[in-house]
Every structure is written in C-alpha cells, then in structure tokens.
C-alpha cells in the first residue's frame, strides 16, 4: 500500500504553480535555433548546446513584470542575451531568428540591441558593462504601461541599464551563444534551483524570487495577468 510519504523531495522541488494560478515558464514548443533543446524542472531549466533562444509561455502587453535567471554551469565562450522578443518575431530551427531580433542586453558586445523587424535588430547603444559568468543572477523589470515600454536589467541586483523599447506585445527571452553550453534556469516566480529562491514575493504575495521585485512590479502568473495584463 502507498502511504503517500514523500521521499527525496526537497522544498525547492515543489512548485507554486497551481490550477488556479499558473506561472510563466519556458515554452518547450518553440524549438528555436541550431542546438538541442531540453526543457526540465517544470519548464524552468533548459539544457542547450548553444545558439538557442528560449522564450516564455505568456505574452505581455500591459502591466509591470519581473523575472530572474541564472546559469549554474557554463562551458565554452559564454555569451547570453537577456530581454524580450516581439510575439510576432520569426521562428525557425535553421537559424536563431528570435535571437537575431530580440530587444535587450547582448553580452557578446555588452550593448543594448533593439528589434527592427521580425528577424533583425540594431545596436542601440554600447554599455561598457562586463559580461556574464556562471552563478550570476540576472533580473528583468519590464514596464509595459509606458509607451514605448521601459525595461531595466540588473546583474546580481545592481542595475546594468534601462532601455526604452519600440514594441508592445512581447515575451521574455534569453539567448545562448553557439559556442557555449550549460544549465540555464529561469524564475518567473517558481524557482527550481536554490540560487533563485530568496523568499521574496511580489506585492500580491505571488512568487519566490532571489531579490525583491521593484515596487509595483509583479510575477508573471495568471492571477496577476488578469489584474494588470490589460485586454491582451
């Protein structure tokens, strides 16, 4: 008989996502780029061999949103892109068109890039920042209530710049360079790695983040989207 006793199950392995309040996760149906695509841990962990963009399952058109991520291990040249992609960006597994058109910070040249079309981008400005290393926690605070939207990216809770975007309907994105591989974890409120579990919820009490979300910013989940996400 089964006595329903849990075994080898840590608190970090339990999800805050419920049938009445689903959190954003990595979209396993978007097989984007040239690399193998392996989504684990409830859509929060992605194993890649490189040249791959990962996007979230929930689109954003209004509201203020916060999410985090970390690479716990890296081999090879470690370039990552952190930001958002337009919901109508080109997709395909023969080239990383999502990564070629995202808006955000690209550590290969430490510059902010801005989408110009469904498959292209331009360098908006050079930042002078340093790149990313294993264990570095990044976070994004996205304000879709401004027109155009405003996005602030932080590294280990220190701001690395604020950028004004030129599109309104977006999904969260991270891009991994072709010559690197490793474990990438995303935290939209349900962390499955202790590096992203700091016990910080948003103002509505949703989510578990490494760092406290900025005032007025919320976890990407269905209850918050219903309250702040506009008409979609």
Ranges and model annotations:
Residues 1-232:
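PRY/SPRY (B30.2) beta-sandwich protein-interaction domains
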């Amino acid at each position: 008989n089964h006595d329903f006793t849990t075994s080898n199950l840590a608190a970090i392995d339990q999800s805050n996502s419920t049938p009445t309040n689903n959190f954003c996760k990595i979209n396993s149906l978007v097989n984007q780029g040239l690399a193998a695509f392996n989504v684990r841990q409830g859509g929060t962990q992605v194993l890649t061999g490189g040249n791959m963009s990962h996007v979230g399952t929930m689109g954003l058109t209004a509201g203020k949103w916060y999410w985090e991520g970390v690479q716990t291990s890296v081999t090879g040249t470690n370039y990552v892109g952190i930001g958002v992609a337009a919901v109508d960006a080109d997709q395909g597994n023969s080239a990383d068109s999502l990564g070629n058109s995202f808006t955000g910070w690209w550590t290969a040249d430490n510059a902010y890039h801005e989408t110009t079309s469904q498959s292209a981008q331009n360098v908006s400005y050079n930042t002078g920042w340093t790149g990313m290393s294993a264990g570095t926690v990044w976070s994004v605070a996205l304000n879709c209530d401004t027109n155009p939207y405003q996005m602030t990216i932080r590294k280990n809770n220190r701001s690395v710049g604020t950028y004004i975007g030129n599109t309104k309907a977006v999904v969260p994105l991270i891009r991994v360079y072709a010559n690197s591989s490793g474990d990438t974890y995303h935290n939209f409120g349900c962390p499955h790695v202790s590096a992203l579990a700091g016990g910080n919820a948003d103002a509505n009490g949703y989510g578990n983040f490494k760092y406290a979300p900025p005032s007025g910013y919320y976890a990407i989940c269905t209850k918050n989207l219903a309250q702040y996400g506009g008409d979609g």
